[in-house]
């Protein structure tokens, strides 16, 4: 079905004699009269006419002129035509030699260098050239902006793009650094050495630890309950019983020292 539609469109766009509707008997007579080799050449020419253009596959253009799709090929063909015309004019002038001085002067006037003929540029080509120029100007503008930002210093930090800000090394600020900054701001302005900064940081951390200990000490503690009388008696009895079981020799020693019991 797709091939039928393609052939119908090809016949509509290219109204050649081969595609015209001719009576069947007449077509057979014409076919018999035309040699077989000529028919093969014509079919090959028709196939290659719309399929190949300077080695480029052109199927799917649906009969439109392929030169409009490639403006570079059009410009080259125009240049060739102009060069051929100029060569033909020069050859004609060389063949017709003037016979008198007046004719020579006329020919000299005619052979003066004329204005160069510029080839017509297609809109697609002009559009591509303008796009290239715009891209080049944008690229140059970005280069200039980046160089200005690099040379500007700290005044142009806010104008830099966000990607450049990510390269800055981030320093972690601790609680000791904050306490040290408070001490520096409250004290009189003087030069501090590295040892002074370390001492202030250690003092701030120890102060923080002592504050935490005080908070823990301030928590209310439950008083230990006093043991009851019954529990005290029970613990005393248990200690006695355990002492008898664990150390029976003590009891034997006591009994021997006291002597035999009398009834």
Swiss-Prot record:
Alphabetized PANTHER family for the sequence: NAD-DEPENDENT PROTEIN DEACETYLASE HST1-LIKE PROTEIN, PROTEIN TILLER ANGLE CONTROL 1
GO biological process: morphogenesis of a branching structure; phyllotactic patterning
InterPro entries named in the record: TAC1 (IPR044989)
Gene of this entry: TAC1
Name by which UniProt lists this protein: Protein TILLER ANGLE CONTROL 1
Sequence motif: IGT motif, positions: 55-61
Species this protein is from: Zea mays
Function as written in the Swiss-Prot or TrEMBL entry: Involved in the regulation of leaf growth angle. Promotes horizontal shoot growth.
Tissue: Highly expressed in leaf sheath pulvinus. Expressed in shoot apical meristem and leaves.
Residue segments, region Disordered: 243-263
Record keywords, A-Z: Growth regulation
UniProt similarity note: Belongs to the TAC family.
